Amino acid sequence: IIKLQKQDETAAIGLAEHYAQTISGALVRNEYHSAILHFYLRHLPKAHQRQALRFVKGWGMGNFRDEDWLRATKDDRRYPALVEKTLVALLSACEKHELRRLNERPPAILQKALDAYADNESLMRLWMKAKLAACKDNEALETLRCLIRKQQRFYLWKELADITPDEQLKLSALCKAILLQPKDEFLG
Protein backbone atom coordinates (compact mmCIF):
# COMPACT_ATOMS: atom_id res chain seq x y z
CA ILE A 1 0.00 0.00 0.00
CA ILE A 2 2.81 2.38 0.96
CA LYS A 3 4.69 1.69 -2.28
CA LEU A 4 1.56 1.67 -4.43
CA GLN A 5 0.40 5.10 -3.23
CA LYS A 6 3.15 6.78 -5.26
CA GLN A 7 2.11 5.01 -8.46
CA ASP A 8 -1.68 4.71 -8.20
CA GLU A 9 -3.41 6.49 -5.33
CA THR A 10 -6.87 5.11 -6.15
CA ALA A 11 -5.60 1.54 -6.20
CA ALA A 12 -3.76 2.15 -2.92
CA ILE A 13 -6.97 3.41 -1.28
CA GLY A 14 -8.81 0.31 -2.50
CA LEU A 15 -6.04 -1.93 -1.19
CA ALA A 16 -6.09 -0.11 2.17
CA GLU A 17 -9.86 -0.67 2.41
CA HIS A 18 -9.39 -4.35 1.61
CA TYR A 19 -6.66 -4.54 4.27
CA ALA A 20 -8.91 -2.99 6.94
CA GLN A 21 -11.76 -5.30 5.98
CA THR A 22 -9.47 -8.34 6.14
CA ILE A 23 -7.99 -7.65 9.58
CA SER A 24 -11.44 -6.63 10.88
CA GLY A 25 -10.34 -5.08 14.16
CA ALA A 26 -7.69 -7.68 15.02
CA LEU A 27 -4.89 -6.53 17.30
CA VAL A 28 -2.15 -5.19 15.02
CA ARG A 29 0.22 -2.57 16.40
CA ASN A 30 3.13 -1.63 14.21
CA GLU A 31 4.37 1.33 12.24
CA TYR A 32 3.02 0.02 8.91
CA HIS A 33 -0.46 -0.43 10.34
CA SER A 34 -0.37 3.19 11.55
CA ALA A 35 1.08 4.37 8.22
CA ILE A 36 -1.85 2.77 6.37
CA LEU A 37 -4.36 4.64 8.54
CA HIS A 38 -2.43 7.90 8.10
CA PHE A 39 -2.38 7.40 4.31
CA TYR A 40 -6.10 6.59 4.19
CA LEU A 41 -7.13 9.63 6.23
CA ARG A 42 -4.90 11.94 4.20
CA HIS A 43 -6.17 10.74 0.81
CA LEU A 44 -9.83 10.08 1.56
CA PRO A 45 -11.93 12.49 -0.55
CA LYS A 46 -14.08 14.91 1.46
CA ALA A 47 -17.15 13.68 -0.41
CA HIS A 48 -16.61 10.17 1.01
CA GLN A 49 -15.92 10.94 4.69
CA ARG A 50 -18.48 8.37 5.87
CA GLN A 51 -16.15 5.66 4.57
CA ALA A 52 -13.74 6.59 7.37
CA LEU A 53 -16.17 5.07 9.89
CA ARG A 54 -16.06 1.66 8.24
CA PHE A 55 -12.32 1.84 7.61
CA VAL A 56 -11.37 2.74 11.18
CA LYS A 57 -13.72 0.10 12.57
CA GLY A 58 -11.89 -2.49 10.48
CA TRP A 59 -8.49 -0.97 11.29
CA GLY A 60 -9.29 -1.28 15.00
CA MET A 61 -9.62 1.60 17.47
CA GLY A 62 -7.53 -0.35 19.97
CA ASN A 63 -4.56 -0.52 17.61
CA PHE A 64 -3.02 2.87 18.31
CA ARG A 65 0.61 2.70 19.40
CA ASP A 66 2.06 5.06 22.00
CA GLU A 67 3.75 6.93 19.14
CA ASP A 68 0.36 7.56 17.52
CA TRP A 69 -0.58 9.78 20.48
CA LEU A 70 2.42 12.08 19.95
CA ARG A 71 2.25 15.28 17.96
CA ALA A 72 5.05 15.97 15.51
CA THR A 73 6.96 19.19 15.00
CA LYS A 74 8.67 19.91 11.71
CA ASP A 75 10.02 23.24 10.48
CA ASP A 76 8.57 25.00 13.54
CA ARG A 77 5.08 23.71 12.69
CA ARG A 78 3.11 21.40 14.93
CA TYR A 79 1.26 18.52 13.31
CA PRO A 80 -1.57 16.64 15.01
CA ALA A 81 -1.12 13.14 16.33
CA LEU A 82 -2.62 10.25 14.37
CA VAL A 83 -5.18 9.76 17.14
CA GLU A 84 -6.28 13.41 16.77
CA LYS A 85 -6.64 13.13 13.00
CA THR A 86 -8.58 9.91 13.31
CA LEU A 87 -11.05 11.20 15.89
CA VAL A 88 -11.63 14.44 13.97
CA ALA A 89 -12.31 12.40 10.81
CA LEU A 90 -14.67 10.06 12.67
CA LEU A 91 -16.62 12.78 14.45
CA SER A 92 -16.87 14.74 11.19
CA ALA A 93 -18.32 11.70 9.45
CA CYS A 94 -20.92 10.94 12.14
CA GLU A 95 -24.55 11.84 11.67
CA LYS A 96 -26.64 13.36 14.45
CA HIS A 97 -28.00 10.07 15.81
CA GLU A 98 -24.47 8.60 15.87
CA LEU A 99 -23.16 11.64 17.74
CA ARG A 100 -25.98 11.29 20.26
CA ARG A 101 -25.15 7.62 20.84
CA LEU A 102 -21.43 8.39 21.06
CA ASN A 103 -22.05 11.08 23.67
CA GLU A 104 -24.15 8.73 25.79
CA ARG A 105 -21.36 6.15 26.00
CA PRO A 106 -18.07 7.70 24.87
CA PRO A 107 -15.33 5.11 24.33
CA ALA A 108 -12.35 5.35 26.69
CA ILE A 109 -10.06 6.34 23.80
CA LEU A 110 -12.27 9.33 22.98
CA GLN A 111 -12.32 10.53 26.58
CA LYS A 112 -8.54 10.12 26.81
CA ALA A 113 -8.09 12.08 23.57
CA LEU A 114 -10.42 14.88 24.70
CA ASP A 115 -8.28 15.27 27.82
CA ALA A 116 -4.97 15.02 25.93
CA TYR A 117 -5.93 17.32 23.05
CA ALA A 118 -8.16 19.89 24.76
CA ASP A 119 -6.35 22.53 22.69
CA ASN A 120 -7.47 20.97 19.39
CA GLU A 121 -10.21 23.34 18.28
CA SER A 122 -11.65 21.03 15.61
CA LEU A 123 -11.91 18.09 17.99
CA MET A 124 -13.52 20.16 20.73
CA ARG A 125 -16.00 21.81 18.34
CA LEU A 126 -17.04 18.41 17.04
CA TRP A 127 -17.42 17.14 20.61
CA MET A 128 -19.57 20.19 21.37
CA LYS A 129 -21.82 19.21 18.43
CA ALA A 130 -22.05 15.69 19.87
CA LYS A 131 -23.19 17.18 23.19
CA LEU A 132 -25.81 19.26 21.37
CA ALA A 133 -27.03 16.17 19.52
CA ALA A 134 -27.43 14.45 22.90
CA CYS A 135 -29.41 17.47 24.21
CA LYS A 136 -26.67 18.32 26.71
CA ASP A 137 -26.85 22.03 25.98
CA ASN A 138 -25.20 23.20 29.20
CA GLU A 139 -22.20 20.91 28.66
CA ALA A 140 -21.96 22.08 25.05
CA LEU A 141 -22.03 25.71 26.19
CA GLU A 142 -19.27 25.03 28.72
CA THR A 143 -17.10 23.35 26.06
CA LEU A 144 -17.64 26.31 23.75
CA ARG A 145 -16.85 28.81 26.51
CA CYS A 146 -13.55 27.02 27.16
CA LEU A 147 -12.70 27.29 23.46
CA ILE A 148 -13.57 30.99 23.40
CA ARG A 149 -11.36 31.65 26.43
CA LYS A 150 -8.43 30.11 24.56
CA GLN A 151 -9.07 31.61 21.12
CA GLN A 152 -11.06 34.67 20.18
CA ARG A 153 -12.44 33.48 16.84
CA PHE A 154 -15.52 35.08 15.28
CA TYR A 155 -17.09 31.74 14.32
CA LEU A 156 -16.88 30.53 17.94
CA TRP A 157 -18.84 33.60 19.06
CA LYS A 158 -21.35 32.94 16.26
CA GLU A 159 -21.76 29.34 17.45
CA LEU A 160 -22.29 30.62 21.00
CA ALA A 161 -25.04 32.91 19.72
CA ASP A 162 -26.64 29.99 17.89
CA ILE A 163 -26.88 27.71 20.92
CA THR A 164 -27.40 29.98 23.92
CA PRO A 165 -30.96 30.37 25.21
CA ASP A 166 -30.14 33.71 26.88
CA GLU A 167 -31.27 36.49 24.51
CA GLN A 168 -28.92 39.08 25.98
CA LEU A 169 -25.93 36.74 25.67
CA LYS A 170 -27.04 35.85 22.13
CA LEU A 171 -27.02 39.52 21.10
CA SER A 172 -23.66 40.14 22.80
CA ALA A 173 -22.12 37.07 21.14
CA LEU A 174 -23.34 38.18 17.70
CA CYS A 175 -21.88 41.65 18.24
CA LYS A 176 -18.55 40.13 19.28
CA ALA A 177 -18.61 37.86 16.20
CA ILE A 178 -19.15 40.88 13.95
CA LEU A 179 -16.33 42.79 15.63
CA LEU A 180 -13.89 39.89 15.27
CA GLN A 181 -14.89 38.87 11.76
CA PRO A 182 -12.31 39.82 9.12
CA LYS A 183 -13.48 42.77 7.05
CA ASP A 184 -13.26 40.95 3.72
CA GLU A 185 -15.60 38.21 4.98
CA PHE A 186 -18.27 40.52 6.37
CA LEU A 187 -21.25 40.56 4.04
CA GLY A 188 -23.32 42.93 6.17
Predicted region positions:
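Alpha-helical repeat scaffolds
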Residues: Q7-I23, H48-D68, R100-L114, D137-R149, ...
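Amphipathic alpha-helical repeat scaffolds of TPR domains
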Residues: I1-L4, G14-E17, Q21-H97, A118-K129, ...
